[in-house]
Amino acid sequence: MGPSGTAHRMRAPLSWLLLLLLSLQVAVPAGALAETLLDAPGARGASSNPPSPASVVAPGTTPFEESRLPVFTLDYPHVQIPFEITLWILLASLAKIGFHLYHKLPTIVPESCLLIMVGLLLGGIIFGVDEKSPPAMKTDVFFLYLLPPIVLDAGYFMPTRPFFENLGTIFWYAVVGTLWNSIGIGLSLFGICQIEAFGLSDITLLQNLLFGSLISAVDPVAVLAVFENIHVNEQLYILVFGESLLNDAVTVVLYNLFKSFCQMKTIQTVDVFAGIANFFVVGIGGVLIGILLGFIAAFTTRFTHNIRVIEPLFVFLYSYLSYITAEMFHLSGIMAITACAMTMNKYVEENVSQKSYTTIKYFMKMLSSVSETLIFIFMGVSTVGKNHEWNWAFVCFTLAFCLIWRALGVFVLTQVINWFRTIPLTFKDQFIIAYGGLRGAICFALVFLLPATVFPRKKLFITAAIVVIFFTVFILGITIRPLVEFLDVKRSNKKQQAVSEEIHCRFFDHVKTGIEDVCGHWGHNFWRDKFKKFDDKYLRKLLIRENQPKSSIVSLYKKLEIKHAIEMAETGMISTVPSFASLNDCREEKIRKLTPGEMDEIREILSRNLYQIRQRTLSYNRHNLTADTSERQAKEILIRRRHSLRESLRKDNSLNRERRASTSTSRYLSLPKNTKLPEKLQKKNKVSNADGNSSDSDMDGTTVLNLQPRARRFLPDQFSKKASPAYKMEWKNEVDVGSARAPPSVTPAPRSKEGGTQTPGVLRQPLLSKDQRFGRGREDSLTEDVPPKPPPRLVRRASEPGNRKGRLGNEKP
């Protein structure tokens, strides 16, 4: 059965499971979920006071009779809240699995749209069964429990360098752009309300300004859900996402300001100036609280090297503490948790272990994904109901003014900011920024938070906000991918940055900093260099411990290098390590080379067992984990070293073949079988023996395997053939046990089974044993997958009697 059949078999049980969960949700009493999300304290009060044993009366008995032990009981109110929350999370997770079973569906329709449609389906079922409005999501649940994980995930994994390089543009769009949209939409709607034919004359100016402030909030949840799939370039992504993240703080400040003005009977000039001061205090105060708690978290994790288990806990506790502390002082919780996450990513990551860091990433991605799914589902569920008021003029003009003022704001503000940017934003980038102004959960929660006593047309505001949210999420979210492809907007580069690229980038940063210093211009390179010096001198010494953990790959590499150094010291090789000062003293030595069969065997062993690199599939997704920088650098180091080893072995093999082809013992197929070469082609090489004698010999022999290929590979050309004997793993020349050289009258020895000759009294001894060459722990792994091969043949020197005939005439080619 093919993949389609397997997918069909997987979808059928999943469909039945979804139907079962839907039936469980419908079977829940009508007010159960409302008690969970709207009146949780009341539900807890009802379930936390169970009846006393004296008041429990079995069916069919009087209060004076003794009750018996029941066999089976059902106490749903006791577990109602956690049971329903678990069911909703399970339903949302299964819905996401079902979407991704159809691979083409998430590429056409964003996941946020699909989740809203699931919520609409559930809300319609609940409304049809109970004939009541489905429960709406409580705003405290959204702001205190569902929104912080999403903002924490976005701030922790945000690329910090592009964010700070575009910080001025982001603040320009977030602050000035939000004020532009809020005031523009509010004044335009107030002008529409003055037309008596529309029946909107009871909506005041402050109410329109309040509605304009909440409807102008670009939602980071919706932006992340859409822009993570289209893979625009990093600069454009940072601008849209940074604006959506920071303008929420501006929106909340304006919302609270206009809400307070609406509840006042008279507004004085002092109140206006207090509102402007409150605007800056809320934003700056939230950032300071986040940075302070981020520093405390880094200082705490400095002392957790003995208790690794609780390291991930501090990341989530301090980040959430920054959010609720800012909310407690009526500051910006979004700014606080974003600043805390970015601070912890810089310092805490270097204190925690690699396993703790992986746990943090997985758990953070899981929390943000679940929160985002629940938000979109409850947006769909809360849409169905009777709490709506429809007015064609107000709804249609609200949608039109949102699009018009968003486009005008982006194009006008970009013309101003391009004067100060090194790389100006193009028309395509401006169009995508204006097109990416998606509304979402922030606007939805704020409009439900309006008090009905102060705003009698609250239902009309809810209806208009839902229309704007659905239009931007569905229409703009679905069409933005083909629009990006049609405009040929620059996409993101998925290629991971190599170590050399990072080194060159840092080099260019220092060069640009020096140029700015010479010119007397204090740009962002100057301030970045100043902060780095301050960070290295004070902050890192205070917040980061000295022996911070490293990657497991780097640790293994370090252990291998230490083991290699110990083996060199034990075998006496460390004393003869050459230095650059002693390169001129190295004497060129001609040693015997290995046979081609032995070279092939060594190359096969090295390619199979030396530095086995674990491959990882890289993909860019918000809910997937990105590759760690230290892991990528260590992996690249090992890959380069493995490549260099193989290249050096390949080069040695090619040199061996060239030398064998140039010796007198080579057999030329163009000559007769027993014909000797001319004297001009016979090259005699003088080789000094241990006793000082020299003899003619060819260059067929053993191979030099460099135990430290790096030390030899980077030598200059004039010294590339010079190496100390301590670095060589070679076979010693034949050592005569009886005498220094066999007499000429010795008859040729009989050939062995392998095809070589065996000389009595002549031994071949390795300089290093097998354990010293490959290590005791590697012996089994090196020979596990390699088939056994015959040992290398023992060959006489060409100068010995009877040997040249055997090599030229009897030896197999």
Curated annotation (Swiss-Prot):
The chain crosses the membrane at residues 108-128, 139-159, 170-190, 210-230, 238-258, 279-299, 309-329, 362-382, 393-413, 431-451, 460-480. This is Sodium/hydrogen exchanger 2. The keyword Metal-binding does not apply. Residues 649-709, 736-813 are annotated as: Disordered. One of its GO terms (biological process) is epithelial cell differentiation. PANTHER family: SODIUM/HYDROGEN EXCHANGER, SODIUM_HYDROGEN EXCHANGER 2. Keywords: Antiport, Cell membrane, Glycoprotein, Ion transport, Membrane, Sodium, Sodium transport, Transmembrane, Transmembrane helix, Transport. It catalyses: Na(+)(in) + H(+)(out) = Na(+)(out) + H(+)(in). Residues 687-696 have a biased composition (Polar residues). The gene is Slc9a2. Disulfide bonds: none annotated. Predominantly in small intestine, colon, and stomach, with much lower levels in skeletal muscle, kidney, brain, testis, uterus, heart and lung. Li(+) activates Na(+)/H(+) exchanger. Its main location: membrane. Glycans are attached at residue 351. InterPro entries: Cation/H_exchanger_CPA1 (IPR018422), Cation/H_exchanger_TM (IPR006153), NaH_exchanger (IPR004709), NHE-2/4 (IPR001953), NHE_CaM-bd (IPR032103). The keyword Transport applies. Interacts with CHP1 and CHP2. Plasma membrane Na(+)/H(+) antiporter. Mediates the electroneutral exchange of intracellular H(+) ions for extracellular Na(+). Major apical Na(+)/H(+) exchanger in the base of the colonic crypt. Controls in the colonic crypt intracellular pH (pHi) to direct colonic epithelial cell differentiation into the absorptive enterocyte lineage at the expense of the secretory lineage. It comes from the Eukaryota. Belongs to the monovalent cation:proton antiporter 1 (CPA1) transporter (TC 2.A.36) family. GO terms for molecular function: potassium:proton antiporter activity; sodium:proton antiporter activity. It is found in: Apical cell membrane. NCBIfam families: b_cpa1.
